[in-house]
Swiss-Prot record:
This is Shikimate dehydrogenase (NADP(+)). One of its GO terms (biological process) is amino acid biosynthetic process. The keyword ATP-binding does not apply. The gene is aroE. It comes from the Bacteria.
Length: 276
């Protein structure tokens, strides 16, 4: 029997998850059916209950349900617990539901594919919302020399930094405190790119050979990546690889087989450019 999987979100029309998982399934010879489902904002739990009752094996979760999925799961992986959000649910053999968060590992794997080395580097994370919280543990497990979380509201960044201090050298700063600081990797975890905006960053922030990463993506370089190029970044990347990477981790956790990320990423990138 074909195993059923889905992604839940609202909105959901734009989701690339079904085509990503279809390509993974074809590549690995796995028999599965993956759909996208628009879920009423106040009906997450009952829709998830119905999905699993009808034989569904696993779910990906996107905006705005990641916190709700966190509460819905009967058990959580340590990284999901840290992230405070869940983008992955799986039904275990005893019928219980386990929640995980594959966003951070998706980003880290993408950086590995790009040959970016995180160990020993000074890393600047922009933003202190759910996207940043979701990537902090996997990022710190790569042993950077330092991670600075910069945010408009300093108290939010401070609270986040405090929660991860046991995993490495993490500190918080306001954007106005970044003058004179220099970083090897800058990661934009704000949604500013979606609105064509840029966090208020000073000039001369980048060390020679610096890498800049935007969790958002589009057919054209985001405003943040345009800034990075103007500032002399040696390497830039958007979040399309993170999207495929988190999906690959989910696929592996469901099917115990690791799909090839690069051909899927290449196909998606081509589709993006064709739509321009």
């Amino acid at each position: 029997m074909t195993d059923l999987y889905a992604v839940f979100g609202n909105p959901i029309n734009h989701s690339k998850s079904p085509s990503i998982h279809r390509m993974f399934a074809e590549q690995t010879g796995q028999d599965l059916h993956y759909t996208k489902q628009l879920v009423d904002v106040d009906k997450f739990a009952q829709t998830a209950d119905a999905f699993f009752a009808q034989g569904g094996r696993g779910l990906n979760i996107t905006v705005p349900f990641k916190q709700e999925a966190f509460r819905y799961a009967h058990s959580l992986t340590p990284r999901a617990e840290r992230a405070g959000a869940v983008n992955f649910l799986v039904q275990l053999s005893d019928g219980s539901i386990r929640g995980d968060n594959t966003d951070g590992i998706g980003m880290v794997h993408d950086m590995h594919n790009l040959d970016w080395n995180i160990a020993g580097k000074r890393v600047l994370l922009l933003g202190a919302g759910g996207a940043v919280r979701g990537v902090l543990q996997p990022l710190l497990e790569e042993h950077p020399a330092q991670v600075v979380i910069a945010n408009r509201t300093l108290s939010k960044a401070e609270e986040l930094a405090k929660n991860f201090l046991d995993l490495g050298n993490v500190e918080a700063k306001g954007y106005d405190q970044l003058n004179g600081a220099h970083f090897d990797i800058v990661i934009n975890g704000t949604s500013a790119s979606l609105h064509g905006e840029l966090p208020p960053l000073p000039d001369n922030l980048l060390n020679p050979g610096a890498c800049c990463y935007d969790m958002m993506y589009g057919a054209e370089p985001t405003v943040f990546l345009q800034w990075a190029q103007q500032q002399g970044a040696a390497h830039t990347a958007d979040g399309l690889g993170m999207l495929v990477g988190q999906a690959a981790e989910a696929f592996y956790l469901w099917r115990q087989i690791r799909p090839e990320v690069v051909p899927v990423l290449t196909a998606l990138r081509r589709q993006l450019h064709e739509k321009k």
